[in-house]
Amino acid sequence: MEESILRMHDKTTLKNMAFNRGLSRRGHNGRNASRMRKQDFIDFIMVQNHRDQSAVLGSDFLGDDMIRIFQEFIMDETFTFNPFIHLMGTIKNSTSKSPVSNQPSPEEDEPIPDLTLKPLEPCTKCECTTCMKNSIKQEENLKVHQNILNLESKIMCVVCQANVRNVVFVPCNHLATCISCSANPLMPKKCPMCRKGCKTTIKIFF
């Protein structure tokens, strides 16, 4: 269901729809269910709709369009977790041949997927059409490889640099660390990205 259609419903209707889709009393967007606004209910329903659609796709190909969309959202360090959840859910399902059986336990960290590109075989320099095409492909692969490295640096935990970020710090709403790092008793009660005080954290499961 499109967001524009959801906006036509009143808050009570959206609340009932959200509870039917699995909303708990703990709420969404850092608010308890009793304190959620109309937009919070819409955000929750949209996330659930996207997860349902992604589960049906089951594709194992991460296309250029997905990388481009992903980059547009994460180029800004001040992004919040709502669009990030939306994209990470898609990527998780699109890179898994069995989305249901391969999902990690909610309390386990998710490692960064291996997105290494296989380079083209080198050839001697010449002016033939085949070699020129291979040269162009090599340049394109290098650009894509660099983009992937940039993406990995954006989605990795800013503390351990090994696992996927899946813990949101409230109230700044930065998606910054993995579950293990956020649970470390030695870690200060501050967001590691903006250094602002943290009132609570929210675990995001994809």
Curated annotation (Swiss-Prot):
Keywords: Apoptosis, Early protein, Host-virus interaction, Inhibition of host caspases by virus, Metal-binding, Modulation of host cell apoptosis by virus, Zinc, Zinc-finger. SUPFAM superfamilies: RING/U-box. PROSITE patterns: ZF_RING_2. Residues 95-105 have a biased composition (Polar residues). Signal peptide: none annotated. GO terms for biological process: protein ubiquitination; symbiont-mediated suppression of host apoptosis. It comes from the Viruses. GO terms for molecular function: ubiquitin-protein transferase activity; zinc ion binding. Pfam families: zf-C3HC4_3. Gene3D superfamilies: Zinc/RING finger domain, C3HC4 (zinc finger). A zinc finger (RING-type) spans 157-195. Residues 95-114 are annotated as: Disordered. Plays a role early in infection by preventing host cell apoptosis. Belongs to the IIV-6 193R family. This is Putative apoptosis inhibitor 021L. The lineage of its organism: Viruses, Varidnaviria, Bamfordvirae, Nucleocytoviricota, Megaviricetes.
